Each structure stands twice: as structure tokens, then as C-alpha cells.
Amino acid sequence: MDFSISYGIQNIGLPLILSSGDLKNICFLIDTGATHNVLFDFVYEHLQDDVKLTNANNRIMGIEGHYIETPIIEATFNFEGVICTSTFSVLNASDAVLNIQNETGIQIHGILGMQFLLENKCIIDFDKLQIRI
């Protein structure tokens, strides 16, 4: 299914997609430069009953460029009827998220990285400003 990313790109220069269903209105940044998926910790705190905490950790480079050990969760998100399950590193990036929100007026809740894009065989079409999941 094709989803528009035009609003985010045209208004703030970032490709964004919103989840629907039970875990709705989770705003994800689509980031082809991110190797892992990320759910920010302030969002995880509200979704703990809806996601599965794994026994694993990831060592990822945070937004500020420092390596951080993060817990890994498994979460399922609905994108207008397309159900996608993947693992996410839970990351504290409050300062960066707040800066983006202050500059753009949009709060980002997580990042869909290459892991998600490959697992779900996503195609990003920048001519049409769409992502196919």
C-alpha cells in the first residue's frame, strides 16, 4: 500500500508516516541513514503494555553521536491496515526530539530505519512523495 510522505517533506523537509489502529498517531521519521529502528523512551513509557520487551540490548549510536546501550522491544504497528512487526531500540533523545518539535511544531515518536524498510520491502518514491509498505 502507498502512503503519502508529502506533508512532512513539504512542510518540514522530513519524510514522516503516522501509525493507525490501537497504537495510533505514532509519528515516525523514515530514515534511510539509520541502521536500527528507534522508539523514543517517552513513547515507550506509554506503550509498555502494548509492546514486548526482549531480553536483548543494542549498542547504537545516538542522535548526538555517542554509543548507547539500549533495550530492545518488539512492537506491531498498523499503517492504515498494513500490519508491521519489528524490533526497536528504546532511546532517550529528549533534547533532540524537543529541538525538532520547537523548530517544526511536530513531535516525532520514533525512527523507522533500514531494518524496517528492508524487512517490509518498502519502496520510497521521492518523485511521487510516497512510501510503499
What are these regions (language model features)?
Residues 1-133:
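Pepsin/retropepsin-fold aspartyl endopeptidases
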